[in-house]
Amino acid sequence: AYLAAKADREGLNISISAFADADGNILESEMLREEYYTVIDYGVVPESLPPVAKNFKISADRQQGFFIRVTSAENQKPGLYRALLSVTDADGKTVKNAYVYAKVWDFSLPVETSCKTAFGMSAYTIYTTHGVTSDENRELYTKYYEYFLKNRINIWGLPFDPLTDEADAFMSDPRVNTFLVAGGYNGHMYGGNRNSSELKELYEKISANEDWAKKAIFYMNDEPMD
């Protein structure tokens, strides 16, 4: 959904009701907004999709984009679901109402992530961008990791060292299909250089679990030139 204004508008709010079918079954949903960035020598582009903020503004002759994320459960009843999208102004007056529909099909996707990926994510960038301590950085890294995993994107660096007990749940998660054992560029916590003793421990632990062994990867040379 996109909103546009001929004049500057402030104090706007947008919301959406629950998606429901004729029998009252409900779909999980949330509103997201397009965040815009100015790219040098290119212009303004939409990039991230954070949750909708209250009391947003739209400048004259500009538009603001919104996305609606709808999620169905594995046993969701198939059929047509409807929700009411509402936009209100600074005085709480309704500016626009519109129905939004979502169709649920009679099949479900597997819990396992079908597409095998290994995306890099910089723990250092998270640390410096948020300006947090190392302990808080681990918490933030985990939140980023789980967010990507929810969207079926596999980050290669686990939130915990594979040698720790905390990593076991992630390595066993059917949505996770790759994880970094050594190498990469996120430091020791998320891969990094390993000595022979650590590699031996990693081998003994991971090789004892066939599922983990299939997911384990090494990335020792980034973009080799030869």
Residues of each region from the PLM?
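Aromatic-lined carbohydrate-recognition surfaces of secreted/lumenal glycan-active proteins
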Residues: K215-D226
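An acidic-aromatic substrate-binding cleft motif
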Residues: T94-G191, S207, D211-A216
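Conserved, mostly hydrophobic/aromatic
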Residues: L3, L85, F148, F218
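Structured alpha-helical segments in the cores of large, soluble enzyme domains
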Residues: E198-A208, D226
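Short, surface-exposed loop/turn segments at beta-strand-coil junctions that are enriched for proline
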Residues: T71-P78
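Surface-exposed binding patches on compact interaction domains or structured appendages
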Residues: Y2-I68
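Surface-exposed loop/turn motifs at beta-strand-loop junctions within extracellular Ig-like
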Residues: S72, D89-D91
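A short beta-strand micro-motif common to beta-rich folds, especially ectodomain repeats
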Residues: G79-D89
